[in-house]
Amino acid sequence: MFDLTTRDIKYLSGVGPQRASVLNKELGIFSFHDLLYYFPYKYVDRSRIYRIREIDGAMPYIQLKGEILGFETAGEGRQRRLIAHFSDGTGIVDLIWFQGIKYLIGKYKVHQEYIVFGKPTVFNGRINIAHPDIDPASELKLSAMGLQPYYNTTEKMKRSSLNSHAIEKMMKSLVGQLNEPLPETLSPALLAEHHLMPLTDALMNIHFPSGPDVLRKAEYRLKFEELFYVQLNILRYAKDRQRKYRGYVFEKVGDIFNGFYSRNLPFELTNAQKRVLKEIRRDLGAGRQMNRLLQGDVGSGKTLVALMSMLIALDNGYQACMMAPTEILANQHYETIRELLYGMDVRVELLTGSVKGKRREAILSGLLTGDVQILIGTHAVIEDTVNFASLGLVVIDEQHRFGVAQRARLWTKSVQPPHILVMTATPIPRTLAMTLYGDLDVSVIDELPPGRKPIATIHQFDSHRVSLYRSVRKQIDEGRQVYIVYPLIKESEKIDFKNLEEGYLHICEEFPDCRVCKVHGKMKPAEKDAQMQLFVSGEAQIMVATTVIEVGVNVPNASVMIIENAERFGLSQLHQLRGRVGRGADQSYCILVTGYKLAEDTRKRLEIMVRTNDGFEIAEADLKLRGPGDLEGTQQSGIAFDLKIADIARDGQLLQYVREVAQTIVDKDPNGSLPENEILWRQLKALRKTNVNWAAIS
């Protein structure tokens, strides 16, 4: 048997150099192996032949057997189309094509018997099937073969006659060459224990299943394997890291922590905060490097927990550092932490790109001597000139905004890697967290401090703008501030949505007595900061902005968030924007403004937003609606999880199950030396070579 991974796809029957080039560029298919692992996205049952008299326009797909009675062309220019009148003796349907008219008239013969497959629609009382699949009836076995696979293709592929049907034919050719079993990629013990189909059977049946039951078994086998190796990679990496990096032992909770707890704590900790703090304290004293992800909705008190963790580092003679993605957020953390530590003998400094000259020199010197105990900053803290006396704990806010390499540079700031606490206000569904941040232990703050009023979310149509502005005026008259967010900076030729510039002028006219500031992504940082400062200080009553305000603005007096063209935003983005209000004691409102015409999934998104403020429920729904590759931040996380068949949203239970299976193997075989696991470690090594990011997790 030849090696599928090295056999060039151009040598497969029906491919050749030209088609191979298209497959290379469009789908990343270079070898026989790549094609074999290009799975169908759906299957259509072609086991039944319908009679024309049975069909109506509401049926999804149908298959007919009959003959072409004749052809005619209709329309002019771009509307020109070929119509074939097709009959099986019980009625007539019109087969319609808008392209390739000459070719089709030459290809199909009148009064010859064909199998036709497609989606019926009704137009002017007649049944039509546009661009159907047609095969000569003599090839009935090829067409009516039960479940037919459908493969995703691109426009460029279709222009090269590489549609789903063409890929299916290539796959038949490839599967026909598998005359002996492929090398197994799971151990005999795993196959037996979990009742998994052998690899060769699974691959043949995923492309050409003999029935629904066999298809389910093939899918299960391939999903199990895919998710299993993702988890085995993450868990093996975590185990190796624990062995390699011992981590500082923070033995005590001392005077600094206790003094803060008894005198400076602004309010009683919630039960969730207490639980998370216990988890962190346990990690810090365990003698292994902490690598923990702290999730919590906006306003849940993550910063307070992070500060108390840093105070434990100080009590044990170490320094702590907090890294934020923007200057505004770093400034905000600095002000908050200084306020919380008021009256305590703790030196806190802020280091951003704006800090220069003698001030910067004094901070760098203080870090080297250990006088600066807590440093808060942006990516400026990872510059080569920044060195610590004894960095023991690093807190990273908004993890997904830092690349793997940036985070790794923090490790070089200490004799051995410091403890790492990653904070995010972007709720990550449990299943996605296991894949994206699987080597991090996860803590969740899932309750808000007492006294916070839930934000009221309302969906309003564009036409109700008069009543909307009346409500805004009432809030401003009561001394509150308002955000108005737009999805685009300037008008697009293709999409006519409200843009920020127009919106800004309109709001200035509508509220002439108010100061309106404007913030968008194309501004210079200094200009943006100046505009934001107008709003933070209360000088401006209204901020008109794009989504740059998702992270980093804390204005307790802002009580209204209006999101224009809310249909243009994803669920997680809407939730993050909503989190800019509801930070004070007053009732806050989030108003989602849309047009009347909404797609079904958009309607669902808006209904979820109106129904719940729970970030984790929203994140799970977003994952189901959009898929993991679209979720904010995941593409920048530095982790490849380009799953070919498994679905993080739908296969959450299986992911949990295979994680436990992988954990058992890593625990029993930490050195990868047991003979029964040889296949698994060999396959993992091969996957790490082909998936470049697998070696650089979190």
Can you name each region flagged by the protein language model?
Residues 267-277:
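N-terminal pre-Walker A segment at the start of P-loop NTPase domains
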Residues 275-278, 286-607, 671:
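Inter-lobe coupling/hinge segments of SF2-like helicase ATPases
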Residues 130-139, 393, 409-411, 422, ...:
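N-terminal cationic and glycine-rich segments that engage phosphates or anionic surfaces
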